[in-house]
Amino acid sequence: MDYDLIILGAGPAGYIAAEYAGKHKLKTLVIEKQYFGGVCLNVGCIPTKTLLKRAKIIDYLVHAKDYGITINGQAKLDWKQLLKQKQEVVDKLVAGVKTIIKGAKVESIEGEATVIDKNKVQVNNTTYTTNNIIVATGSRPRYLTLPGFEKAQQAGFIIDSTQALALEGVPKKFVVVGGGVIGVEFAFLFASLGSEVTIIQGVDRILEVCDSDVSELISKTLKNKGVQIITNAHVVRAENNQLFYTVNGVEQSVIGDKILVSIGRIANTECLDQLDLKRDHNNKIVLNEKLQTSTTNIYLIGDVNTQMMLAHYAYQQGRYAVDQILNQNQVKPAEKNKCPACIYTNPEVAFVGYSEMELQKEKIDYVKSSLPFIYSGKAIADHETNGFVKMMFNPKTGAILGGCIIASTASDIIAELALVMENNLTVFDIANSISPHPTMNEMVTDVCKKAIFDYFS
């Protein structure tokens, strides 16, 4: 065999798997079709957060008087400079990924790969043999195939999230189809940049994967920024920059200079089409608990297996899959219920474990403790009191079942809850820990102390 391992894709799952394999002396080849660093680094997590940080600064400037600051003169948005900074960040991190791969003594090739059989991969008209294959080919935006959509896409009116990060200017009117995580983040971004934003959502609230209290707070915040949210709306067609939809059977329309379609993502599994892998009734490739396909030397990790489309979940799967090949059992499998997730709105949303909605659906007994950030000295000092911390506990043992944080720094705080859940700590362990004061983090401790008084004393 030419290699011990061939990895298709150098995104978060693939390059971490490559690094781990290389450092464990596996002769490894990684093949990347387009982006070293994947969607996340090039046209996803990193560039959006770069722009959202600038949007947050704009929000601070708009509300400078609330902080006792008077600005003389007009602050102007330089969109081209923002895009330049975004690309500089991306380029720097892409270079870092390539350095990681090279440093692990892993070979790399640019090109589109196809798996010929369980031991052969073809790229750039050359076939390579291998003992193991890891597929980490990621995902792509899902499109709507409705009347007029293809024409509107070709004309540049209807765009996806990748195109939204490379617009020539800030659109006056920006329409978002889909009120999930990606759609809501872009709504915040362009509303802060000055666009008139409308969200078209198919169900009765945005962020439907979250509890209703989360959706309500973020909806209120968006509306305060001038964003119009239309729920229970079903998109039916497009005519250039005009989007038609129905609410309760009545057809309406909205005009947008740009219309972002953000309705989920599709796994890139085409490289496996020549194989007869076991699939379920939805044509999804079936995996076992070791992330192996029915051909057991072929693994699927990251977005392509659709388990949880998050970069940090992919990181863990990358290490875990290689660990299975090495038969070392040193890396724990990624557990969905202990993996945190973040939404980079302003304030941010972060959660881990069960939501209340999930606990109720699965009929799991729980008690809840929560506090708004108006109880936090640091939040008051920072003028950042919009949000709360809530946690759910096993009423008998005090085990933490889940938690949600809405705060200006929620994405930084949630790691504390994830670590606690990963190590099976309880409400008592957190309540007995000492948090620095004043910080936003101490609200987690305060919520646990409140829970003990309310339920466990």
UniProtKB/Swiss-Prot annotation:
Keyword Disulfide bond: yes
UniProt cross-references to SUPFAM superfamilies, sorted A to Z: FAD/NAD(P)-binding domain (SSF51905), FAD/NAD-linked reductases, dimerisation (C-terminal) domain (SSF55424)
Main location as per UniProt: cytoplasm
Recorded GO MF terms: dihydrolipoyl dehydrogenase (NADH) activity; flavin adenine dinucleotide binding
Binding site for NAD(+): 178-182, 235, 262-265
Annotated function: Lipoamide dehydrogenase is a component of the alpha-ketoacid dehydrogenase complexes.
Protein name stated in the entry: Dihydrolipoyl dehydrogenase
Source organism of the structure: Mycoplasma genitalium (strain ATCC 33530 / DSM 19775 / NCTC 10195 / G37) (Mycoplasmoides genitalium)
